[in-house]
UniProtKB/Swiss-Prot annotation:
Keyword terms, alphabetized: Bile acid catabolism, Lipid degradation, Lipid metabolism, NAD, Oxidoreductase, Steroid metabolism
pH dependence: Optimum pH is 8.5. The enzyme is stable between pH 8 and 9.
Outcome of swapping residue 159 to H: Reduction of the catalytic efficiency by 87.7%. No effect on the affinity for cholate and NAD
Site (Lowers pKa of active site Tyr) residue list: 163
UniProt site positions, description: Transition state stabilizer: 146
Pfam families in the cross-refs: adh_short_C2
Outcome of substituting residue 159 to F: Loss of activity
Gene Ontology molecular function, alphabetical: chenodeoxycholate 7-alpha-dehydrogenase (NAD+) activity; cholate 7-alpha-dehydrogenase (NAD+) activity; identical protein binding; NAD binding
Protein name listed in UniProt: 7alpha-hydroxysteroid dehydrogenase
Binding-site list for glycochenodeoxycholate: 99, 146, 151, 159
Length: 255
């Protein structure tokens, strides 16, 4: 029988990385509104603090923590901070990442950085919080991957392959952690109208995107936050090892 309480996160404690803006910010606010206590992590400390202020104004509990996800030391400090402030970690949302288009003849440092942002940080932070989740009977790890993981395009070698690696981590970590009652899933967003996308999209590009989108609009950060809430809630207690594409049914390309 359906129970709306299964979409609540009351009593849960969550870390959300890259939560100072865009999708991560919306996930943090949505989770807090659903009852979770959240650590808002971002490389931009001011942005993280602003999100915490918004959550507190809504009556939620949140703490800000600056973190450069390419630093193992800072990831470890983030996990320690969350445990010290929240007492436990039930949910990790690995939203921070990056990379973007790079030419094939890119320096190897650029190629490595895509993997540091999208793969190594996700895996290491998961390693850090999984034992804490196990102590408390289980938990949920969610990563924001990309439709680029399954698609092909010019100048996307480093970004797309790193996101494909992250997606495959989801599938394999679900097996590694399932016996500990830790679920692992991912979301592959389509074109989401974050401030970052709004700064580069033109009306012509948007119209081209809409031609390939059965639901004739581009996504909003709340669309991804809603999917994240489901996947991290008790309503998805038998969902693990999955990548959920949220794209209005289409494939949008920024070219």
């Amino acid at each position: 029988m359906f129970n709306s309480d299964n979409l609540r996160l009351d009593g849960k404690c969550a870390i959300i990385t890259g939560a100072g803006a865009g999708i991560g910010k919306e996930i943090a606010i949505t989770f807090a509104t659903a009852g979770a206590s959240v650590v808002v992590s971002d490389i931009n400390a001011d942005a993280a603090n602003h999100v915490v202020d918004e959550i507190q104004q809504l009556g939620g509990q949140a703490f800000a923590c600056r973190c450069d996800i390419t630093s193992e030391q800072e990831l470890s400090a983030l996990a320690d901070f969350a445990i010290s402030k929240l007492g436990k970690v039930d949910i990790l949302v690995n939203n921070a990442g990056g990379g973007g288009p790079k030419p094939f003849d890119m320096p190897m440092a650029d190629f490595r950085r895509a993997y540091e942002l999208n793969v190594f940080s996700f895996f290491h932070l998961s390693q850090l919080v999984a034992p804490e989740m196990e102590k408390n009977g289980g938990g949920v790890i969610l990563t924001i991957t990309s439709m680029a993981a399954e698609n092909k395009n010019i100048n996307m070698t480093s970004y797309a392959s790193s996101k494909a690696a992250a997606s495959h981590l989801v599938r394999n970590m679900a097996f590694d952690l399932g016996e500990k009652n830790i679920r692992v899933n991912g979301i592959a967003p389509g074109a989401i109208l974050t401030d970052a996308l709004k700064s580069v999209i033109t009306p012509e590009i948007e119209q081209k995107m809409l031609q390939h989108t059965p639901i004739r609009r581009l996504g909003q950060p709340q669309d991804i936050a809603n999917a994240a809430l489901f996947l991290c809630s008790p309503a998805a207690s038998w969902v693990s090892g999955q990548i959920l594409t949220v794209s209005g049914g289409g494939v949008q390309e920024l070219n």
